[in-house]
């Protein structure tokens, strides 16, 4: 009996040590991503400025191949800017203290839609929502959460007009369960966990642009608010993302 207890304690100590090492490793990776992303911004800004200058001064004055090469370089700088800014945003969310206040989720959704107005106009997307509640949240992070989920719903479409609907209902624990439903390309159930991982992509860059960080950022935001995020979907049949947030301590049931 004594030997069994000793072995169990050794195993528990080993697991605890490994968990601490993993946590430290994750923190170091996040710090590296933040530093690398920050330090890469200035040289990329310089490259982008000079390529734009070339485009303005020499477009149409050289041969067709030159115009094509300059256009490719411009496109490359745009994609590089996204590759740099997304990890930086993730690391900032991971490091920032979450300031919880009574927040109108309807207002934060509207802020997100303003940020997405270009994509909404280009795709002719229809974005509707039910009356949404006041919750305990960091307003900027909740805006980012809605922006990522609605932005993905607009982006991951093959044919037709994106249709997105946002709703909320109280769950059994008295928390608000939000749903973001779309009519997009859907997700195979075997990839449900994978889509929330860092740099995880289910499609090639040629099919859909992106860094594979968007849903990982959503997961980080929700978890830092003490909630959970999940997805229901079938390939080709649209997706519904669910996330939970605490109700407002002030007892405001619905946004005005």
Place the predicted regions along the sequence by residue.
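Short alpha-helical segment of the dimerization/phosphotransfer core of two-component systems
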Residues: 75-80
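PAS-family sensory domains
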Residues: 1-4, 181
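Glycine-rich ATP-binding loops of the HATPase_c
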Residues: 226-232
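Short alpha-helical Gxxx[C/S/T] motif in the catalytic ATP-binding
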Residues: 214, 218
């Amino acid at each position: 009996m004594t030997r069994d207890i000793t072995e169990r304690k050794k195993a528990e100590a080993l697991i605890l040590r490994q968990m601490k090492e993993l946590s430290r490793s994750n923190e170091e990776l996040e710090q590296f991503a933040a530093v690398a992303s920050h330090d890469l911004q200035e040289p990329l800004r310089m490259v982008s400025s000079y390529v734009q200058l070339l485009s303005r001064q020499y477009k149409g004055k050289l041969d067709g191949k030159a115009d094509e090469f300059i256009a490719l370089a411009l496109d490359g700088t745009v994609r590089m800017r996204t590759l740099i800014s997304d990890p930086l945003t993730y690391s900032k969310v991971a490091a920032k203290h979450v300031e919880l206040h009574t927040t109108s989720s309807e207002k934060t959704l509207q802020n997100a839609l303003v940020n997405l107005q270009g994509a909404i106009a280009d795709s002719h997307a229809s974005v509707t929502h039910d009356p949404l509640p006041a919750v305990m949240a960091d307003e900027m992070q909740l805006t980012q959460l809605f922006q990522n989920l609605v932005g993905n719903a607009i982006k991951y479409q093959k044919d037709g007009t994106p249709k997105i609907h946002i709703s909320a209902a109280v769950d059994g624990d008295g928390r608000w369960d939000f749903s973001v439903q779309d009519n997009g390309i859907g997700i195979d159930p075997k990839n449900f966990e994978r889509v929330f991982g860092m740099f995880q992509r289910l499609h090639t860059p040629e099919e859909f642009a992106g860094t594979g960080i968007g849903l990982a950022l959503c997961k980080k935001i929700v978890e830092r608010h003490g909630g959970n995020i999940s997805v229901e979907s079938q390939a080709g049949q649209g997706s519904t993302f669910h996330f939970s947030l605490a109700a407002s301590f002030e007892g405001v049931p619905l946004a005005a």
